[in-house]
Amino acid sequence: MAKITYIQHDGAEQVIDVKPGLTVMEGAVKNNVPGIDADCGGACACATCHVYVDEAWLDKTGDKSAMEESMLDFAENVEPNSRLSCQIKVSDALDGLVVRLPESQH
């Protein structure tokens, strides 16, 4: 299991054990993390699982695909460290990953 810390816009933290092979979004949804709406269910089609990856983890989460880049155009307050959490596959290498959630997904 990889421990992932989800930090809400207000600073509240939730640390979740996520099984390798799942996505950061799936870990959030399975554990009722507020702020990850995941309207499309993880199909990279809605941008409602937008997160900010902690700078220390950017290299370990992999590159954004062209599709993810396109979908981020629909997210609010996009930053250079913005990712769609449905596109970050959890592995043991991501144990300790920290992501911050935007104020709103819509």
Curated annotation (Swiss-Prot):
The keyword Electron transport applies. Its cofactor is [2Fe-2S] cluster. One of its GO terms (cellular component) is cytosol. Keywords: 2Fe-2S, Electron transport, Iron, Iron-sulfur, Metal-binding, Transport. This is 2Fe-2S ferredoxin. Binds 1 [2Fe-2S] cluster. Pfam families: Fer2. The keyword Methyltransferase does not apply. It comes from Caulobacter vibrioides (strain ATCC 19089 / CIP 103742 / CB 15). [2Fe-2S] cluster binds at C40, C46, C49, C86.
